[in-house]
């Protein structure tokens, strides 16, 4: 009787360990997939910014410092891998892009340019997509981190060296209209 109870207890613990491990792996993959979605949108944004800079440069040659700042921030954003540090760069880049768009008020020919208006619409759409992807990613990070930090899953997480994921904190500057 005691041996059967012991075998049953071991089987239950083993089953729980397997289920817990599989849930942790699932959550880790969700975080990776969600980050991939964020990365796709950031790359789309990074591809649009040089086009916007070039359109503004053609119409507003005297705004060189704004153009250089946006270009520098875009290059830093492309190179950064850490979600927390990338969030800081992307927030600054968003402010720079908003300054570029605000230049249209001072240059009527730029404001009327079809390519500028198209780029502005694409950037607005991309900013919205980044926010959707960021929310999903941060939700996936929250699920994984909660599972890693709560008992009894933390036992399996520590045993298999699961690590918490970083949140992606990025708040774009609201467009001034």
Q: Which residues are covered by each model-predicted region?
A:
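A helix-centric hydrophobic-segment signal that preferentially recognizes long
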Residues: 2-177
């Amino acid at each position: 009787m005691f041996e059967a109870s012991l075998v049953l207890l071991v089987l239950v613990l083993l089953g729980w360990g397997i289920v817990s491990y599989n849930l942790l792996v699932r959550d880790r993959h969700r975080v990776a997939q969600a980050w991939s979605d964020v990365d796709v949108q950031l790359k789309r944004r990074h591809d649009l910014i040089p086009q916007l800079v070039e359109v503004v440069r053609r119409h507003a040659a005297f705004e060189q410092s704004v153009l250089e700042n946006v270009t520098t921030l875009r290059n830093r954003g492309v190179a950064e891998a850490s979600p927390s540090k990338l969030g800081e760069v992307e927030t600054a880049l968003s402010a720079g892009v908003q300054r570029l768009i605000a230049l249209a008020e001072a240059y009527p020919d730029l404001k009327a340019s079809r390519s500028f208006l198209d780029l502005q619409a694409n950037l607005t759409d991309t900013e919205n997509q980044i926010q959707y992807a960021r929310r999903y990613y941060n939700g996936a990070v929250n699920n994984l981190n909660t599972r890693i930090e709560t008992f009894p899953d933390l036992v399996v997480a520590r045993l298999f060296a699961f690590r918490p994921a970083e949140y992606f904190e990025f708040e774009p500057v609201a467009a001034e209209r």
